Amino acid sequence: MLRVTTLASSCTSFPLQVLRRRLTISSLTSFQPTTKTQVVVIGAGHAGCEAAAASSRTGAHTTLITPSLTDIGKCSCNPSIGGVGKGILVKEIDALDGLMGKVTDLAGVQFKMLNRSKGPAVWGPRAQIDRELYKKYMQRELSDKKAHPNLSLLQNKVADLILYDPGCGHKVIKGVVLDDGTQVGADQVIITTGTFLSAEIHIGDKRIAAGRIGEQPTYGISNTLQNEVGFQLGRLKTGTPARLAKESIDFSALEVQKGDALPVPMSFLNETVSVEPTKQLDCFGTHTTPQMHDFLRNNLHQSIHIQDTTIKGPRYCPSIEAKILRFPDRSSHKIWLEPEGFNSDVIYPNGISNSMPEDVQLQMMRLIPGMANVEILQPAYGVEYDYVDPRQLKPSLETKLVDGLFLAGQINGTTGYEEAAAQGIIAGINAGLLSRQEREQLVLKRSEAYIGVLIDDLINNGVIEPYRMFTSRSEFRISVRADNADFRLTPIGAQLGIISPVRLSQYSRDKHLYDETIRALQNFKLSSQKWSSLLQANIAPQAENRSAWEIFRFKDMDLHKLYECIPDLPINLLDIPMHVVTKINIQGKYEPYIVKQNQFVKAFQADENMLLPQDYDYRQLPTLSTECKLLLNRVQPLTIGQARRIQGITAAALFELYRVARKPSQPVM
């Protein structure tokens, strides 16, 4: 965790402006808002829910503002949480005492660990959820005054921001103005508006002003950020498939995908999930057909969404139109039919998002096996929206141009519930700490968390298409895993005072059992000959005795097998929870590789400890190329390590940066 010191502005006072209504207040002292709080969170999607809860856990008085309290926690697209890479983000959010993992365990209808056939470093916890239960339990969490005594929920729509210009090149946030003219004063504001900024929905050739079907977009915030403050904004697009009537689908000949016999909870607080293993709902697999592809190709001209190639959609979750254009030789694409809840008659067809006219959608759907008589309950659509170039953010997710303004979620160019929630919890923690005059900010390193990788990628390289998390993005994935997220991050959260006593107690108990068990295994040593005899295996002889911990490196070896084969092993397996046993088994397998990786981590950390001056004008370094000067001035990297990861920064430029860098103990240049 990097500790960032934030200094208060000492600039001369200039008038305060409520930019949407052009209200000008003569001085900062004369500003009298209708109501006052410490942190305002705009939007109650996945980023907003985590941001509001995290901010309140710091002790900051927090107000979550949303147009509809009944839509808090609404899942706009797929009815699932987690997956490869994404599931690790959920575990990290949970380790910081976030909500997503706990709510998923309550609302899940099917749990499955993806990538089981591969190494544990790339396992992906995933759950199908009941949409209505997810909303219900998320709303219950946020309304729990015992858990979040400092959190208030306000049903209203934010029209614009209230900014103060001290005249020193950047502004200061002072609150928001609502649609009804109410001014809410705040020390920090977090924008988590998802796909609602200047958004429009596309169905065929129709353009509809909406951020989600049936819900109006917001324009004032985009206008203020771009035209009044000077943020660089861009446009991205995404889409969602049609919702189908369950009774109109013939599942009899389709592939069945069941949940795991022993579901693995998303939250470290839980040993089990709410749904009984035998009562998990099935998913069903089908596929597109050549006939459907031909039909769709003949109708692509009817979609304005797919015709606009200047605005990028998600590469790794493309629409069916994009798949057919990108992979013309493929005769079929997989579709998973996912249930939307225990009592729901709605099916979500994962893998066939599109923006075709409604009549075309119905005809093409009926060319898919099992769906000859399918009925569409809600049409598929594409959505196009504004995002802010994330290179204008600090690692804390505070903006560089407006003090106290934080951005989280799809507004930063990401896609996915989990990526949004991960940003939300970091923005919420840091906004809350800042409002309480805390000098520390939570900035996770790439070597500490996938959240660190996510934010580091965004702020250094920006996005040209919606960003999605994968395990391949992390250089440290053998040590930064789903199973050990609590051991990595809960102590960091505890230092900041954001971890509940219940979670901290469980973490301490699990860590003690983990450490004691590994210590016992390291101290229990036998000769290679004795190990061979006990395990009925061929253990190569060596001069020194081998510890039980070393034996973990052998294929098919785990704690249960050791316990069964060695009566004298000084542990009681019955006293160790299954999730701790899993941690020990995985750590034992990866231990030799982690030792090697730690050498790389040390080299990585050396560059992370070389600090660069803040607000430095790199144009004064004559040996830098024009491109490098522009990149460095835009990103304003905090360290040599961060500068190294900016695309376009050359080795020669890095050599020059070492001249202006300093170690933490040295004064700022």
Curated annotation (Swiss-Prot):
It is found in: Mitochondrion. One of its GO terms (molecular function) is flavin adenine dinucleotide binding. Changing residue 431 to T: Does not completely restore mitochondrial DNA-dependent respiratory chain activities in respiration-defective mutant cells. Belongs to the MnmG family. Component of the MSS1-MTO1 complex that catalyzes the 5-carboxymethylaminomethyluridine (cmnm(5)U) modification at the 34th wobble position (U34) of mitochondrial tRNAs. NCBIfam families: mnmG_gidA. This is Mitochondrial translation optimization protein 1. It comes from Saccharomyces cerevisiae (strain ATCC 204508 / S288c) (Baker's yeast). The lineage of its organism: Eukaryota, Fungi, Dikarya, Ascomycota, Saccharomycotina. The gene is MTO1.
